[in-house]
């Protein structure tokens, strides 16, 4: 299956066509750990462990089990080429990965087929998911800083959760430090990411994110920052949420 150079994908209120085009151009490089997606590959083990551990605490599973997510339905919104879908499928989850970029979905399907993983990939948006579908775990990882309406997007995510489910969101804080590190440093100095990958004014502070979630009857139960240590040349989970951060939310009791 060849990847097409352009594919507009579906249109919905939360989708920015410019953002789709931007990431569609990178579709063939998603699985290259040394390519333009290298930063995502480097933080991926931390994302996986954070989500896995949060899910195991919530659903009372043994995180050390190779099938710790067995029987749980997971929706990965903005899944790209499946960097999260594949490991969680291996842990037993029933994963649906959605992305508005047809080229990303094509890349995801090719890679999953090679690995013989039964992942349900769909070129669609969160607004187009059947409202009768419900998920134990909803992921919105590095997505909300690319949508046009954060509140509407999160509301739709919340509506797709099972009553006892969790939502995990990863994004970038909006302050001088995130501008210096995530844009100037990552895109212009270190060139870890293509220039224009992020727009600083679309970053979301933890307080803003929590306010949105509260509006949909949800509370934040866990949170963590992701920090790069240049001396050790590695990323780690941290209480420092000034730049990259993740939160776990669930319906308030």
Swiss-Prot record:
O-methyltransferase that catalyzes the 2 O-methylation steps in the ubiquinone biosynthetic pathway. GO terms for molecular function: 2-polyprenyl-6-hydroxyphenol methylase activity; 3-demethylubiquinol 3-O-methyltransferase activity; polyprenyldihydroxybenzoate methyltransferase activity. NCBIfam families: UbiG. Keywords: Methyltransferase, S-adenosyl-L-methionine, Transferase, Ubiquinone biosynthesis. The keyword S-adenosyl-L-methionine applies. S-adenosyl-L-methionine binds at residues 47, 78, 99, 141. Its EC number is 2.1.1.222, 2.1.1.64. Pfam families: Methyltransf_23 (PF13489). Belongs to the methyltransferase superfamily. UbiG/COQ3 family. Signal peptide: none annotated. This is Ubiquinone biosynthesis O-methyltransferase.
